Amino acid sequence: VKLGLAVAVPCGAALLIWPAFFNGYPLLFSDSGGFLHQTLEPLMLWDKPYVYGPFLHAFHWRISLWGPVIAQGLILSHLLWLTQRVVRGHATPLWHLGLCAFAALATAAPFSAALLMPDIFAPIVVLGLFLLGFGGAALTRFERGYLLALVALGIAAHLAHLPLALGLCGIALLLRLWRFPVRLFAMALPVVVAVAALFVTNAIGHGRVALSPYGSVFLLARLQEDGPATAVLKARCPDAGWYLCAVTDRLPMPANDFLWAPDSPVNRDATGKPRFLGGMMLAPEAGQIVAEALRANPLGVARAMAGNMAVQLMSFAIGDTLDAAHFAVAVRPRIEQG
């Protein structure tokens, strides 16, 4: 069994990261440079948890980015091995390679595994929580400890994984109420560890005990495009005295432009002066505006959320920020620095 594991898991990993081999290099996104920046300086970025950057550093050590992508492939392959063992009662190399080949050819898994972004932890969190909740005696004590640490890392690495994990724990709670055997505490523990890790890293790096010290800016970006936040601004300005009162004539605008465009109100004031770390500076009033939008028009916010979810589920696109200009600014300097 150990020999089969030692052979099948690396072979499965190779299948799961085939896009990197096809590309001749790990796949990169413009944000990959930011995560590399976290440990190369080091630097606490206002818009990203200080989690995935250290994970990358643990495997590249300023030598090669192939280390992290191979690690991601091995982690995912090993979780599929454990899942097979829990579901079937045992795991075999042939079944494992077949499962990895199916995932590599019929799902988006290889494009996440070959990409240096924390998105890879979404399937890792799902599989890990399943194993913790339903693995039972099929897992050793070491494997349960490993899964606890891995799932906690995955939840903390991307804030979207926290509601995902909470939702899965909620389903497990319902199953437990229906007398279905599930280890609810084992599933909840990595969520608690992840939340604690976010509190600690943000307290150290930003001086604020919070899950996302500046997350209100992202909510504002979304709600001003959808309308509820823009309605609040136009109703309350100029009396509210908010910074954005000076630019209400430019709103709403696409959320992505609001956050990142060099000439957006976030990054350049009404006089044309650049605002360094404009998103970070906007956070206090962003929280106030979002709170007022939720109070004033909760149904409108809910409708916008449902509509955005439907659009996202039905819309598919590739190549976002994969042009040379983005890489020249965001990624290449970090690779050269390493």
Residue ranges and their predicted role:
Residues R144-H158, P190-L198:
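Membrane-interface alpha helices of multi-pass inner-membrane proteins
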Residues I124, A160-L175, M187-V191, S212-P213:
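Transmembrane-embedded, aromatic-rich helix segments that form part
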Residues K2-L27, A104-L105, P190-N202:
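Transmembrane signal-anchor helices characteristic of membrane glycosylation enzymes that use polyprenol
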Residues F111-F121:
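Short acidic/glycine- and proline-prone juxtamembrane loop motifs at membrane-interface regions
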Residues W66-L97, A101, L105, I124, ...:
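Transmembrane-helix motifs of polytopic, lipid-linked glycan transferases
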Residues L211-Q337:
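Membrane-proximal stem/loop segments at transmembrane-domain junctions that anchor or position
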Residues L82, F121-A138, E143-V151, C169:
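Specific aromatic-rich, kink-prone transmembrane helix
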Residues F21-F35, L43-F55, F59, I63, ...:
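Extracytoplasmic catalytic/substrate-binding loops of multi-pass membrane glycan-assembly enzymes
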